[in-house]
């Protein structure tokens, strides 16, 4: 029985929880070898029994049988299309239709958001927001896709009155880092946490007495060890993570939460500045 085909064709027959399971299995079929029903249940916010019933609805005796069958189908499909289909990103191949690609990308980003939010320590997050709010000066560092996330955060913080530097040039980033002072904050964004340029900036900032906040993955890394505070992000991307799609989604969820938290701390003044900024930019049209 081709379970992948059955899952794809039975969408209208699924309940809300069953559709969650179906989407997860389709988006993560290449990684099912290391997925248990317990992990799935926790990640999707449903019961393990729901997953077992879903497997039985498709004709399998239980989740283990369904999982092994899906792994086999995926492997056979890869072998069959290996000479023609290119692995484009995560579980997406060149044989996928745009509809399938859209569903896979959407689920991948949903998972990144769900997993990242599940890790939040809100007491620590509140402390981080308070530390940032009192900083005379904020530096944001990052490379590649992380730099884009940092730039977006810098614009948001400047809009509500914070003094922020977010330079693209790594030499300038290092120069700014060594000029930080006690009370200043450096926000270092790096999923790997091992980029030498970022580590150099963090070491310089710490030496000057600045507080370092890292937005990084759960993996042990130089950045994680050096930071005073860490905000964890989760991304399902592995060997194809260079395109950093779900990574940026996870990072943006963290930076947006920081921004809204800072607005909330000083809501009246912040909203006035946002309004003034909007009025000024409207005059440029």
UniProtKB/Swiss-Prot annotation:
Residues 37-56 bind DNA. The keyword Transcription regulation applies. Residues 1-77 form the HTH rpiR-type domain. Keywords: Carbohydrate metabolism, DNA-binding, Repressor, Transcription, Transcription regulation. Pathway: Amino-sugar metabolism; N-acetylmuramate degradation [regulation]. It comes from the Bacteria. Homotetramer. Represses the expression of the murPQ operon involved in the uptake and degradation of N-acetylmuramic acid (MurNAc). Binds to two adjacent inverted repeats within the operator region. MurNAc 6-phosphate, the substrate of MurQ, is the specific inducer that weakens binding of MurR to the operator. This is HTH-type transcriptional regulator MurR. It comes from Shigella boydii serotype 4 (strain Sb227). The gene is murR.
